[in-house]
Design a protein with these regions (language model features):
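Active-site/acyl-donor-binding loops of N-acyltransferases
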Residues: 2, 129-131, 141-164, 271-346
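Amide-forming acyltransferase catalytic core, primarily the GNAT-like/NAT-type
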Residues: 3-76, 141-238
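Structural motif
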Residues: 14, 74-75, 91, 127-130, ...
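Short, structured motif recognition centered on aromatic/hydrophobic residues
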Residues: 61-62, 85-89, 110-114, 124-125, ...
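Conserved acetyl-CoA binding element of GNAT-fold acetyltransferases
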Residues: 83-101, 235-250
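Conserved GNAT acetyl-CoA-binding A-motif
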Residues: 86, 117-129, 265-277
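Conserved acetyl-CoA-binding loop-helix of GNAT-fold acetyltransferases
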Residues: 98-115, 141, 249-264
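Intrinsically disordered, low-complexity segments enriched in Gly and acidic/Ser/Thr residues
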Residues: 221-271
């Protein structure tokens, strides 16, 4: 009796007919977002077909269907321009009743999403609330491992007119460009250990894709103190990440309130992500009225193959074979005698 129920669950790429039939998407106001994802899904197929010509930027979307009823959707996005690492969002449930358990729907949907772009895609990452034990257990079942915790912050009400950095010379707030992205890149990488850097396989050019209104870099000449980038892989739109150098600069206590005020004024910021154990930064945020949200956990799954060097047979020959070439091949010549020589009869 259970086989017909299980066989009725289908996983398909998002297409226009799904949007036309899904009443929940239209009523929730998410139709424009799914239309943009649908266009991105078409572009992503061309990007994955020509990876050497087109950088990977467009998302892919899969839907779970029970007959003609849409149960859930999942969006996958490139995490780098190379297309070697992608990020998943937790499946978005439509709220429709189903004969299938929600865990089965999420499991099958995510399992199918992990096949997108193979074999080019070598690793995956996903962000989960640390309090969502079910989601973390599901991702662990699919081969994901915890990589790094983050702290989420909810913003205060923005002020009418943000302050200026003129009193904190020579600091300046610059937009993210090719030059400032290269300056920010070491700070973005210093908080990630080597295994995480291997999984994400990113380059400083990938920071350009995380630029949005309100993002920028706080610099003192050629030295970067902090930066703010947009998390495009987050399911919560309007999520920004605040980065800073490992060494705490006392000027950040005055500069960060000004910077965050500009981000609130210019960008549609709904939440801010920081390092989980950054106590000095947490004190500055709390003093400015930011409230702690939930803890987030970055999980990753790597399919990189460790390259084992093959033994070079030419270098593994025995010493006898090597020195054998030095041995004489013919009869040995007599050694000269050191005694008196007889040149003839006396």
């Amino acid at each position: 009796m259970s086989e017909p129920v299980l066989s009725s669950l289908r996983i398909e790429p998002l297409n226009p007919s799904h949007l036309a039939r899904c009443r929940v998407i239209a009523e929730s106001g998410a139709l424009p977002r799914f239309q943009a994802v649908l266009i991105g899904d078409w572009l992503a197929r061309f990007e994955q077909r020509f990876p050497d010509l087109l950088p990977s930027r467009s998302p892919r979307c899969l839907v779970a269907l029970d007959e003609d009823q849409l149960l859930a959707t999942v969006v996958a996005r490139p995490y780098n321009r190379r297309g070697t690492c992608w990020t998943l969002q937790l499946p978005e449930l439509s709220g429709e009743t189903s004969r299938h358990s929600l865990r089965d729907v999420q499991h099958d949907l995510l399992l199918e999403a992990l096949q997108l772009g193979a074999p080019q895609v070598c690793s995956w990452v996903i962000r989960c609330p640390a309090s969502d034990a079910d989601a973390i257990a599901l991702m662990r079942e699919l081969g994901f491992q915890p990589l790094r915790p983050y702290q989420s912050w909810l913003p205060p009400q923005p002020s009418a007119s943000p302050s200026s950095l003129r009193g904190i010379d020579p600091l300046s707030w610059l937009p993210i460009t090719r030059r400032t992205a290269q300056l920010l890149w070491p700070i973005e990488q210093v908080g990630n250990f080597s295994h995480l850097r291997q999984i994400t396989d990113r380059h400083w050019l990938d920071l350009l894709d995380r630029n949005a209104p309100g993002c920028g870099v706080l610099v003192d000449g050629e030295t970067v103190l902090a930066g703010c980038i947009c998390l495009t892989e987050s399911s919560d739109h309007g999520t920004f990440e605040l980065l800073r150098d490992v060494a705490w600069d006392p000027r950040l206590e005055q500069a960060l309130p000004v910077v965050l005020g500009r981000v609130l004024q210019q960008g549609a910021l709904r939440s801010l992500i920081t390092a989980f154990d950054d106590a000095p930064l947490s004190r500055v945020l709390e003093a400015q009225g930011w409230t702690r949200g939930g803890e987030q956990l970055l999980l990753g799954r790597s399919m990189w193959r460790r390259h084992v060097a093959h033994r070079n047979l030419q270098l593994s020959r025995s010493l006898d074979d090597v020195f054998g070439r030095l041995r004489p091949q013919g009869s040995p010549l007599p050694n000269p005698s050191l005694g008196p020589r007889c040149l003839g009869p006396r």
